[in-house]
């Protein structure tokens, strides 16, 4: 179902934890990720990949993106060469991390509204933590988050629920009063296993139709995040219990 455009209610959001995926949810990172992948493919004498093909590969971390990218280019990564290529890719990407990337429309206003309502905000991403912080810093978004937990800072990466639970714990939150906002099957699976409701955006990088991923609520615009979180916290009996 799709969220209704309600007026955010501070008492429901106050003290709740809203955990966000990064790539394809908060920020449209595909342009710089695609460019970085195609640069390293060119260095290896391989043809570039179409933008839309690579866009669907984003969200599982740098190593997974390289593995899928090289396979799609017809040269599956050899286990011995993978570490050096991943390191090279990360260096290339860090050098252009926000050249063409930017927050999706409505992100800043929604984050401001959520913080004003007393919610605890965190980033739960399969991106490496230092890359995530560098991206958020470059886009002036770090100020809105109480914690940034990349795959390398968690016991295991999404879809393992421990990633989401560690993110909630990092802000002193309670899984019983939390929402996961994402765009992919990894977000949906991690949240389901952690018993946290999932809000999925329809404009992200998922390969499968977002309607098939098992999210509790879908939104077409980021401006609907505050009202959708209220809906989920209320319908799941997770509203502010007099805190």
List each language-model region with its residue ranges.
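Residue-level detector of anion-binding/catalytic polar loops
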Residues: 47, 120, 197
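Active-site neighborhood of HAD-like aspartate-dependent phosphohydrolases
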Residues: 7-56
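Metal-dependent phosphoesterase signature
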Residues: 71-109
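Alpha-helical substrate-recognition element adjacent to the catalytic core
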Residues: 43-73, 79
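Conserved SAM-binding loop
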Residues: 19, 26, 103, 121-124, ...
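Substrate-recognition element of Asp-dependent hydrolases with the DxDx(T/V) motif
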Residues: 25, 37, 107-137
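Hydrophobic alpha-helical core bundles mediating ligand binding, dimerization, or RNAP-core interactions
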Residues: 37, 41, 58, 62-66, ...
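Asp-based, Mg2+/Mn2+-dependent phosphohydrolase catalytic module
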Residues: 2-18, 52, 112-115, 129, ...
């Amino acid at each position: 179902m799709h969220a209704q455009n309600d007026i955010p209610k501070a008492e429901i959001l106050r003290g709740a934890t809203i955990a966000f995926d990064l790539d394809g949810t908060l920020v449209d990172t595909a342009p710089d990720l695609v460019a970085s992948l195609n640069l390293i493919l060119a260095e290896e004498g391989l043809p570039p990949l179409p933008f839309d093909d690579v866009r669907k590969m984003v969200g599982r971390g740098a190593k997974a993106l390289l593995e899928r990218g090289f396979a799609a280019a017809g040269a599956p990564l050899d286990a011995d060469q993978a570490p050096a290529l991943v390191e090279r890719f990360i260096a290339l990407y860090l050098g252009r991390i926000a050249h063409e990337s930017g927050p999706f429309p409505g992100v800043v206003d929604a984050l401001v509204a959520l913080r004003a309502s007393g919610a605890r905000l965190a980033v739960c991403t399969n991106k490496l933590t230092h890359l995530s912080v560098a991206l958020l810093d470059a886009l002036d978004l770090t100020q809105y988050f109480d914690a940034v937990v990349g795959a390398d800072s968690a016991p295991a990466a999404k879809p393992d629920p421990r990633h989401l639970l560690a993110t909630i714990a990092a802000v002193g939150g309670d899984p019983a009063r939390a929402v996961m906002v994402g765009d992919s099957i990894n977000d949906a699976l991690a949240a389901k296993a952690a018993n946290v409701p999932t809000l999925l955006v329809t404009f992200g990088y998922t390969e499968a139709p977002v309607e098939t991923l098992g999210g509790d609520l879908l939104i077409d615009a980021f401006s609907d995040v505050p009202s959708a979180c209220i809906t989920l916290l209320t319908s799941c009996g997770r509203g502010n219990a007099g805190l």
